[in-house]
């Protein structure tokens, strides 16, 4: 996915998030471990969101494209975010994927809440 394509799908995901009552508080948060596409508040819960798009399913769906290695990078990046933004460090956290599959004119969207996480951290689901 090119940068401009990524920005397009992240904006679409942001609109989906807003339409469901959550608020995006950060976009493209980056640290040495990686990047988190969107960070949102869903009620009192802090949500870290990976956005994916696949035009064709030849190599799997957009949802399936979030590998365990990518999940680990998102988890480590979230820890850095929480360390550097103390106002959010006591909130429960969730890790979601918003996946878009198909051509732009007939794309399907799927928001998988709690797609991955770590059991040993008290604030992660």
Feature locations, PLM:
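Protein kinase-like catalytic core scaffold
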Residues: 34, 45-47, 96, 110
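Residues at secondary-structure transition points
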Residues: 4, 8, 33, 57, ...
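Short acidic/glycine-enriched loop/turn segments that link adjacent beta-strands
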Residues: 31-34, 105
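Acidic-basic catalytic patches of nuclease active cores, encompassing PD-(D/E)XK
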Residues: 1-27
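Mid-chain, well-packed structural core segment of small domains
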Residues: 64-93
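Domain-level recognition of nuclease-like catalytic cores that cleave nucleotide substrates
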Residues: 84-125
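Conserved catalytic cores of phosphodiester-cleaving nucleases, focusing on short active-site segments
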Residues: 17, 36-59, 74
């Amino acid at each position: 996915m090119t940068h401009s394509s990524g920005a397009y799908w992240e904006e679409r995901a942001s609109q989906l998030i807003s339409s469901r009552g959550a608020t995006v508080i950060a976009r493209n948060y980056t640290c040495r471990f990686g990047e988190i596409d969107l960070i949102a508040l869903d009620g009192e819960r802090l949500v870290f969101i990976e956005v994916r798009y696949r035009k064709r399913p030849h190599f799997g769906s957009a949802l399936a494209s979030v590998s365990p290695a990518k999940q680990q990078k998102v988890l480590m990046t979230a820890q850095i975010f929480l360390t550097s933004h103390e106002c959010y460090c006591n909130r429960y956290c969730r890790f979601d994927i918003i996946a878009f599959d198909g051509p732009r004119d007939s794309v399907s969207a799927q928001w998988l809440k709690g797609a991955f996480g770590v059991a040993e951290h008290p604030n992660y689901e």
